[in-house]
């Protein structure tokens, strides 16, 4: 069973050790970099929720949710008042086993509880040369909106 868990001193190093396949590293930042980004967001007064993804008691992935505009950074127009799945990764050892699909469903279920407050939309960005991610997000109802977050395409889901 998939569980989403907060990052603690007890699981930090297990989660930091998670990694994607070598060819995927250009598409997603590491857990360590993600945690630094979360720290900067939180220290600046923004909202970031880094989460470990567990299959039973085994850490299999990492996700990070953000809410609203981020402080001290250029924000995509869609960011204002909405949720963002800033990071989603499944460790290389657990890919191609359905873990990613189950984890993404659990993450969306959590976001739909509106943990940071009400919002009409959730958005995610991805590299155009990552068709697996594009198909996964589309299968959950995310639709490209024509905007970019840096060099990444943005897709949006109504909550």
Predicted regions and their residues:
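Short coil/turn segments at alpha/beta junctions that flank glycine-rich nucleotide-binding fingerprints
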Residues: 97, 117-118
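Active-site acidic-Proline motif in GNAT/NAT acetyltransferases
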Residues: 91-93, 97, 128-129
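Conserved active-site alpha-helix within GNAT-family acetyltransferase domains
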Residues: 101, 127-146
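Acetyl-CoA-dependent GNAT
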Residues: 2-86, 91-93, 104, 110-116, ...
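Terminal substrate-recognition subdomain of acyl/acetyltransferases
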Residues: 143, 147-159
């Amino acid at each position: 069973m998939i569980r989403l868990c907060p990052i603690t001193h007890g699981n930090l190093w297990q989660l930091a050790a998670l990694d994607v396949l070598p060819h995927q590293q250009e598409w997603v930042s590491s857990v360590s970099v993600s945690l630094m980004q979360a720290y900067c967001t939180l220290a600046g007064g923004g909202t970031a929720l880094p989460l470990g993804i567990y299959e039973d008691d085994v850490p299999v992935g990492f996700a990070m949710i953000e809410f609203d505009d981020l402080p001290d950074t250029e924000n995509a127009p869609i960011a204002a008042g909405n949720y963002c799945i800033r990071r989603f990764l499944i460790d290389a050892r657990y890919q191609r086993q359905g873990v990613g699909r189950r984890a993404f469903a659990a993450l969306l279920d959590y976001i739909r509880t509106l943990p940071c407050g009400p919002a009409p939309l959730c958005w995610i960005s991805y590299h155009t040369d990552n068709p697996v991610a594009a198909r996964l997000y589309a299968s959950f109802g995310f639709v490209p909106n024509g905007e970019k977050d840096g060099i990444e395409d943005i897709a949006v889901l109504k909550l």
